[in-house]
Amino acid sequence: MEIRDIRAVLFDMDGTLVDSDAVVDRSWSTWATEYGLSPAEVLAVAHGNPAAATVAQFLPDVSDSERAVAGARVLELECDDVSDVVPTPGAHELIATLERLGLPWAVYTSAPNRLAKVRLEAAGISPSILVTIDDVAHGKPDPEGYLRVAELVGVEIEHCLVVEDTLVGLAAGRASGATTAGLKGVPADIRLPDLHHLVQLFTE
């Protein structure tokens, strides 16, 4: 699909619109250490993955209540640490460009609602439509979230561009039927060095 055929842009949050990599690394490293796990092994899957899925993967033998406590601990660590959460390069410019062109945009994130709002506010980004892991039954790589956010935006998914920075997120976008754009070298229909490049594509 050509860029001119795109009628809405659906963004991932962490690593795509919001640079929270350092916070994610710190929070999950602390959590892993507290639970006697390897921070490197946990970090290898934590980025872009729903926190509950990561917790379940590394604590498969604990009770549901213990797993809930572990998940709450991660959320506490992440919500309390926004010291260096910033917009990714080009994020504000791209949003301004989309709004100038009359193209709706929205955010779908694997983060829970509380954390998403904290990070978006820290980065100075205010989506009118936000779908989080709290709003869906199945997180990424399931396409449910992107299908849901496209419905809320009011644009058929085939005319949406999903912008992601992880393989699991792009898998969700691809499965939804959207055109995909990938940051950080991940394979997608459109590969982006940064969001400035997407500004150029929409305005050239």
Features from the language model and the residues they span:
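A generic secondary-structure micro-motif detector
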Residues: 18, 41, 84, 106, ...
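Hydrophobic residues in well-ordered beta-strands that form the structural core
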Residues: 19, 107-109, 182
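N-terminal helical cap/lid subdomain that shapes the substrate entry/recognition surface
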Residues: 2-93, 99-101, 112-117
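Asp-based, Mg2+/Mn2+-dependent phosphohydrolase catalytic module
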Residues: 1-8, 96-99, 103, 112-204
